[in-house]
Each structure stands twice: as structure tokens, then as C-alpha cells.
């Protein structure tokens, strides 16, 4: 079974406290509801021998590496979201990096490919198939997926109920956009059946 999935990687994107927890400045409203499904996707991936890659945002305390439109959230008096080393930058409860087998990518922009070593790491690992879970569908999920397609990954899958946006309407519209460029969009149940 593991042989079937050896060219596959699961990208778990931005499942961090500052994006998921109630009351966080950058909370994705639909994020909390997908946590159990993301946990299950990770469990299934590990059972099948699929490489798990954790994609997280981490910024410096002054926000010098954050997008211009977010810099107002960072100053010497104000701690912005997902500051490296803070609780807000940690993965939500229930998700843990397996230091021996998993890989972690730190990004400072929407796409997991932008100014990171993700593409070269996937190439040297022999990965040609990507499965995506996490938040937020119109931003980091979508940009990563569109970049993967632009980089000619032949098989990109977004687990629709293990990804989320601020509203169901935004989520659905973005899933449709990704489906229209050839991305597979199964539910967790459909994807788990494919794994059997």
C-alpha cells in the first residue's frame, strides 16, 4: 500500500492557533470546525506512508517580513499574529509534527512555494502528487494550489471538508475555481475511500 502513495505528500497549511482559535485577530471563522477532519487526514496519511509537510507562517516580532497590508498589526508595542516562538504560531491542539518523519516549511506569504524550498524539497523527495488540507481556502490554500498547478504537479487534491474559509460561500467558490483548473476536490470520506 505504501508503494502506491510514495510519490504523494500531504501539505497541512496554517493550522496554527492565531488562525484557528476563537478571538484571534486573524481567526478564520470556519477553521475550528475542520480541526477533527485535518487530524484524521494526517492520521490516514501516516497510515499510508504519505509524507506529511507542515506549512506554517512565522513572522518576526516587528513584522519586517510580513505583507505590506498587514504591517499595521506589528510594532514594538503590539505583538502581531504568528510571531515565531509564540503560542499563536503553534499548531492547534490535536496536531503535532512527527520530528522523525514529517517536514516543516515556514512561509511569510500566501503560497507555500513563494520564497521557500518547498518545490526543491518535493522534487528531491520524488513527490509528484499533492494533497492539501488547512486554511484559508481563498488565500494560502488557493495560492499554493495555483502555484502547484503552474509548476506542473500532475496530481493536486484539495480535501474540501479539511479546508475552510471565513464563510461557506467563499470556500465553495474557491473550491470550484480550483476544480476548474483540474484539481481534485474530494471530501475526507471520498479521499479515505480512495486510500482503501
Swiss-Prot record:
Stretches assigned to coiled coil? none
InterPro entries according to UniProt: Isochorismatase-like_dom (IPR000868), Isochorismatase-like_sf (IPR036380)
Instruction: List the record's Gene Ontology CC terms alphabetically.
Output: cytosol
This protein's source sits in the domain of life called Eukaryota
Q: Name one Pfam family in it.
A: Isochorismatase
**SUPFAM superfamilies, A to Z:** Isochorismatase-like hydrolases
Please report which protein family the annotation says this sequence is part of.
Answer: Belongs to the isochorismatase family.
**Known function:** Does not possess nicotinamidase activity in vitro.
Name the record gives this protein = Probable inactive nicotinamidase At3g16190
